[in-house]
Amino acid sequence: MLVPSDMIAAQSKMVYQMNKYCADRVQVRKAQIHKQIQEVCRIVQDVLKEVEVQEPRFISSLNDYNGRFEGLEVISPTEFEIIIYLNQMGVLNFVDDGTLPGCAVLKLSDGRKRSMSLWVEFITASGYLSARKIRSRFQTLVAQACDKCAYRDIVKMIADTTEVKLRIRERIIVQITPAFKCAGLWPRSASHWPLPGIPWPHPNIVAEVKTEGFDMLSKECIALQGKNSAMEGDAWVLSFTDAENRLLQGASRRRCLSILKTLRDRHLDLPGNPVTSYHLKTLLLYECEKHPREMEWEENCIADRINGIFLQLISCLQCRRCPHYFLPNMDLFKGKSPGALENAAKQVWRLTRIMLTNVRCLEEL
């Protein structure tokens, strides 16, 4: 197929603009975040060392692997989440019956005594390992550790939340979340994935992702708020971070995500936080399904993919619903105010219009 020369010229210009944007904006953002990560992890490691002295069951899994920290998630340049993996689910069964959107429970196996569990005092009368009880104990230990650690002058616990959150130097927020890793399991609520008839991802990658499994996090679940569920405090939030990261390997998908995050931080960091980097990551995964071929993710296609993701984001904001990639019954906009979502839709449309109509737009963005 012959392609008009002016289209090739426009594509070449956009590739040049994208490369320049990555060098001028994306890499600067990454360097700033890397610097923050080094300090954040140094402080949190010191706090967790103190926690472990008080309570050996909470062993820090925050280890440095060639500059990468396992369990560290960047929410924004000033907000981080650190997952601490707990030991020995042991005598507990994973129960996912769909009654708790985005969540599941851990229940004592039939015939097993509480005393056989490492976490005996956090098991309820009904035999459930309570996420809230474990988090409450962990929060107390972290608060005590903050008062004793070497960085006590610059690190403070954030009050008025059941989450374990620290404020460092008054400007960085770090959430520390206890979790269990569920390898070799795949939740029933995500059993529909991947959808039949869609060629992405490749079956080998699907098998790899499902074998790797998922995490269960002890944190507040927005999907359950207001439901007055008796299970709300005992439930664990399902997390697929490793699966999502595995799916985004190859071609320019990771690069696309880095550009989206940079655009979000610079132009869509709005009141009420209606658009997060996780929303963009989710829509990127849906875009991968729409464009399954590797050639559709080469550098000359990135601008089209980003515009497609922003148009989908506008649609989600206007409908006030953004379905989770693996758990589509879970709405990632739940808890966001209609006004904040409406304002975000206007801002995203303004940004998209600039990108669609100006080949040199990235010089200003």
Swiss-Prot record:
Q: Which SMART domains match?
A: Mab-21
Q: Which Gene3D superfamilies match?
A: 1.10.1410.40, 3.30.460.90
Organism source for this protein? Answer: Drosophila pseudoobscura pseudoobscura
Task: Quote the gene name from the UniProt entry.
Answer: mab-21
Output this protein's name: Protein mab-21
Q: Which family does it belong to?
A: Belongs to the mab-21 family.
